[in-house]
Amino acid sequence: METKAKNRFINSITLPHYEFTIKSPAFKKEGEEFTIWFLEGILEKNPNYVDCLMYLGNAYTAHGMYEKGLQIDQRLCSLRPKDPILYYNLACSHALLKNIDAAFDALEKAILLGYNDIHHLERDKDLTYLRKDVRYRKLVEKIKQH
């Protein structure tokens, strides 16, 4: 009986309507720019919030901020050193910055940790620059053997 009373109370709450204008330039951001600002704000209070870091890394990369994306990916790999997806993302960040040796090191680590999505690997535009290197085919063959 008490639960019904609580539910009835919650359903009958009416919040007041306020009209106001936010003049802060931060709230004038849109799209990826707003997303980045918002996620950075969350990380100020929770610097090791992995899901937030993952979204922020993706947002940086989508916005062409590859150096910042790389820093996030490195941080994520230190927080979760056994996650193959994080090393795959690290490889992508290095590849976008044309850090070829570092990209191959991270990609090899991802594969050693269990990354095996050849379909995605072969189509990922972030890795385009790596496909010209003989090491790329060797890593693909390594995945196929497992």
Predicted feature locations:
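TPR/TPR-like alpha-solenoid helical repeat scaffolds
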Residues: 21-29, 117-142
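Conserved positions within tetratricopeptide repeat
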Residues: 36, 70, 104, 131, ...
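A short structural micro-motif
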Residues: 59-62, 127-128, 146
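TPR/TPR-like (Sel1-like) alpha-helical repeat modules
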Residues: 101-118, 140-146
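Alpha-helical adaptor scaffolds
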Residues: 20-29, 35-98
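Long, contiguous interaction/recruitment modules in multidomain scaffold/adaptor proteins
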Residues: 1-34, 145-146
